């Protein structure tokens, strides 16, 4: 299983114009070198950060986006 950091790096490669609303959560994900949904970034869990990223990433579209979003959803369930 990939870490949240690895996934965030791929998102940055695939999503050219990251939404300013999703960017803070993407930046936080890039600091979580774990695949544990309970891993912490400051006071927030990875699950919290990913959930907020997903809710703000509606502009991230296409086959890669669908695959990555599904991967993230499965990691926080």
What does each model-found stretch correspond to?
Residues 8, 26-29, 47, 65, ...:
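Generic L/I/V-rich hydrophobic alpha-helical segments across diverse proteins
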Residues 33-61:
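Acidic, low-complexity, intrinsically disordered interaction modules
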Residues 22-25, 50, 56, 68:
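Terminal low-complexity, poorly structured segments
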Residues 7, 29-32, 57, 75:
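Low-complexity, intrinsically disordered/propeptide-like segments
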Residues 56-77:
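Short, compact, well-ordered microdomains
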Residues 2-28:
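N-terminal acidic leader/helix
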Residues 16-23, 37-40, 61, 65:
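Residue-level signal for secondary-structure boundary elements
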């Amino acid at each position: 299983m990939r870490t949240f950091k690895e996934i965030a790096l791929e998102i940055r490669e695939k999503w050219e114009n990251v939404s300013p609303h999703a960017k803070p959560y993407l930046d936080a994900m890039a600091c979580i070198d774990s695949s544990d949904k309970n891993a912490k970034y400051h006071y927030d869990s990875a699950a919290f950060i990913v959930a907020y990223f997903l809710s703000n990433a509606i502009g991230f579209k296409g086959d890669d986006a669908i695959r990555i979003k599904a991967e993230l959803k499965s990691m926080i369930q």
